[in-house]
């Protein structure tokens, strides 16, 4: 329309002449006709007429050419007089009314603006929920056996959990086998366990094995910025599930929507509670139906609402724990199938050296070993690559580029020597694996210990010896350097944590006895924290602090007594660390037992300025007791030296 409007105004074959050009044509007497035109749609005024052009070589007569000159004739008296002198005393006036063109031009900006808004909102609506009215629709993805290649053969190390979820698949395939005895399929199964143990992998295996529809959704997919969307999505998901019954609904990280009600401050939790109420009704309410099995996974069962956990909603709880030595070996063999492994690789030995590792960490270990071997240009992955990957995953990568002064290296060497000597001399400690003053991860130096086997209980004499080893670094600094550093901050922090566990939870204090004094610090809800009072008096709190201090002070004095008795061994080990930087278990034990080393390692090619952080680390020997940090005790991590 715009092109049409312009073509109408301009006319076909009309030449545009300027005022000087028109003046020349008038002087030459070539202008034959003139009309004054006023265009009301554009507000322009111009002269329009015809002039003659001499004939060309191929033309027989003069050519008459239409032209147009934009000019304001009404206010140009000189031009009027000039035109009158050239034979045009009176000029006709013509008014043009182009209503449709004018109307179109006036609304064109608004049309463009509305069009831009339309495309913008259309794109956002598509991104938000596949349509303007689909915010309340379920985002559960429907999977079938052909869409996932994971089966129960790919799940290893959690045999008991695998057996329990396999029963669901067997029931769906042959329900009469169970129904003839009056049994019914569980309405819900809650998989609980630490992160990385294979809960989601089990769900993928169920999807790969089951011959029924499998809906998969995350707990966070129910929550949206709009009020009421979560409850609507829950209802829509179960409505779809009932249409496809019998089927399985898997909710990953259900703690995102199933947290206990009545906690938290403000109104943000009301929407989540509304979503949870809808979930409770759909799982076991008036309109609930059999044939829809709900499987959920979480690593925070303690935060879930009690109404969600009762039988009728989740009839069965499946514990997916950290794998034992046999489970770790099975997991390693599953993941080792994806890499080129050399014949000398011993996965059984690697499984013994990875206590406390989850399935995800073992998968990462195998991948790191493959990357290390590829970086070295090898054709396959051998045992040293696996050992190096294990140390990297557990204690961090070596930081050889970190430059430190000789004084700091010396402090680190004596600190680690103190840990190592006590670890060898004391009876109830885990075997030493390696000692290094090369930085690893956040630590400047590491004393590595690996348990000989999986441990599930902490005996008191083991805990006391561990506390003594933790004090070894600080004592060695004090005895040999005459000063102390901040390198023991991680040891002190975790020794305090361990001693408080002994007093408050494990009943290992003779003074306070077998009473549980611990606050429920695992609860992360502000509302529940505000409503919880400490279950003991101020006098008891002071007694707890005194007992914690007593355990740590006793460990410190014992460590100091042993190090003073074996100063020559600590000195020899520290000097060996300064010279070689890294010593293995046999070399450390030989120095502690004989005072010398007959089979020293090759000297490190790295600059002697590379040092380490005065810290010790030990693998988590007790899988039930882990903390945020890693380190000498379960979860201990060093601090700057």
UniProtKB/Swiss-Prot annotation:
Zn(2+) binds at residues 415, 419, 491. Its cofactor is Zn(2+). It comes from the Bacteria. Residues 1-100 are periplasmic. SUPFAM superfamilies: FtsH protease domain-like, P-loop containing nucleoside triphosphate hydrolases. Pfam families: AAA, AAA_lid_3, Peptidase_M41. Residues 593-641 are annotated as: Disordered. Residues 599-610, 630-641 have a biased composition (Low complexity). Keywords: ATP-binding, Cell inner membrane, Cell membrane, Hydrolase, Membrane, Metal-binding, Metalloprotease, Nucleotide-binding, Protease, Transmembrane, Transmembrane helix, Zinc. It is found in: Cell inner membrane. It is an enzyme of class 3 (hydrolase). Residues 122-641 are cytoplasmic. Its EC number is 3.4.24.-. The active site is at 416. In the central section; belongs to the AAA ATPase family. In the C-terminal section; belongs to the peptidase M41 family. This is ATP-dependent zinc metalloprotease FtsH 2. It comes from Methylacidiphilum infernorum (isolate V4) (Methylokorus infernorum (strain V4)). The lineage of its organism: Bacteria, Pseudomonadati, Verrucomicrobiota, Methylacidiphilae, Methylacidiphilales.
């Amino acid at each position: 329309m715009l092109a049409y409007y312009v073509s109408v105004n301009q006319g076909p074959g009309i030449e545009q002449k300027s005022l000087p050009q028109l003046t020349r044509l008038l002087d030459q007497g070539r202008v034959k006709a003139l009309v004054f035109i006023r265009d009301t749609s554009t507000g322009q005024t111009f002269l329009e007429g015809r002039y003659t052009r001499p004939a060309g070589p191929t033309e027989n007569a003069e050519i008459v050419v239409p032209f147009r000159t934009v000019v304001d004739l009404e206010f140009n008296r000189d031009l009027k007089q000039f035109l009158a002198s050239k034979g045009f005393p009176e000029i006709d006036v013509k008014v043009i009314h182009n209503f449709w063109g004018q109307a179109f031009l006036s609304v064109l900006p608004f049309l463009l603006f509305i069009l831009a808004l339309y495309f913008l909102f259309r794109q956002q609506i598509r991104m938000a929920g596949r349509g303007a009215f689909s915010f309340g629709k379920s985002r559960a993805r429907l999977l079938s056996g052909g869409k996932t290649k994971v089966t129960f053969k790919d799940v290893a190390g959690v045999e008991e959990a695998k057996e329990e979820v396999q029963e669901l698949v067997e029931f769906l395939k042959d329900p009469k086998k169970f129904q003839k005895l009056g049994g019914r399929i569980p309405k819900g199964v809650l998989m609980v366990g630490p992160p990385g143990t294979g809960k989601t992998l089990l769900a993928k295996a169920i999807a790969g094995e089951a011959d029924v529809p499998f809906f998969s959704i995350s707990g966070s997919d129910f929550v949206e910025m709009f009020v009421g969307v979560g409850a609507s999505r829950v209802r829509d998901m179960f409505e779809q599930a009932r249409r496809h019954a019998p089927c399985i609904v898997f909710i990953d990280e259900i703690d995102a929507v199933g947290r206990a009600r009545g906690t938290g401050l403000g109104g943000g939790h009301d929407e989540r509670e509304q979503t949870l109420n809808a979930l409770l009704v759909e799982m076991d309410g008036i309109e609930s139906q059999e044939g829809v099995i709900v499987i959920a996974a979480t690593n925070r069962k303690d935060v879930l609402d009690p109404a969600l956990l009762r039988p009728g909603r989740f009839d069965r709880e499946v514990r997916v724990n950290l794998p034992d030595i046999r489970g770790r070996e099975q997991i390693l063999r599953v993941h080792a199938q994806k890499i080129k492994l050399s014949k000398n690789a011993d996965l059984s030995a690697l499984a013994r050296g990875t206590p406390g590792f989850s399935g995800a960490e073992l998968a990462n270990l195998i991948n790191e070993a493959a990357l290390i071997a590829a970086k070295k240009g090898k054709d396959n992955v051998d045992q040293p690559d696996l050992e190096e990957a294990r140390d990297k995953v557990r204690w961090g990568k070596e930081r050889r580029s970190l430059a430190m002064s000789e004084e700091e290296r010396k402090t680190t060497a004596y600190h680690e020597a103190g840990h190592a000597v006590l670890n060898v001399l004391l009876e109830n400690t885990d075997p030493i694996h390696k000692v290094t003053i090369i930085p690893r991860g956040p630590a400047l130096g590491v004393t590595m210990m690996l348990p000989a086997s999986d441990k599930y209980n902490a005996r008191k004499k083991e805990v006391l010896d561990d506390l003594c080893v933790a004090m070894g670094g600080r004592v060695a600094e004090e005895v040999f350097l005459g000063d102390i550093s901040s390198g023991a901050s991680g040891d002190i922090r975790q020794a305090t944590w361990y001693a408080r566990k002994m007093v408050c939870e494990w009943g290992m204090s003779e003074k306070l006895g077998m009473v549980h004094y611990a606050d429920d610090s695992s609860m992360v809800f502000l509302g529940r924290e505000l409503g919880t009072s400490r279950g003991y008096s101020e006098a008891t709190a002071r007694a707890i602090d005194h007992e914690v201090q007593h355990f740590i002070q006793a460990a410190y004095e014992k460590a100091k007594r042993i190090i003073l008795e074996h100063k020559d061994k600590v000195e020899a080990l520290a000097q060996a660390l300064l010279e070689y930087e890294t010593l293995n278990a046999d070399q450390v034990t030989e120095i502690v037992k004989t005072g010398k080393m007959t089979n020293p390692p090759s000297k490190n090619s790295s600059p002697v300025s590379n040092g380490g952080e005065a810290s010790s680390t030990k693998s988590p020997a007790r899988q039930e007791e882990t903390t945020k940090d890693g380190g000498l005790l379960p979860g201990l991590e060093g601090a700057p030296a």
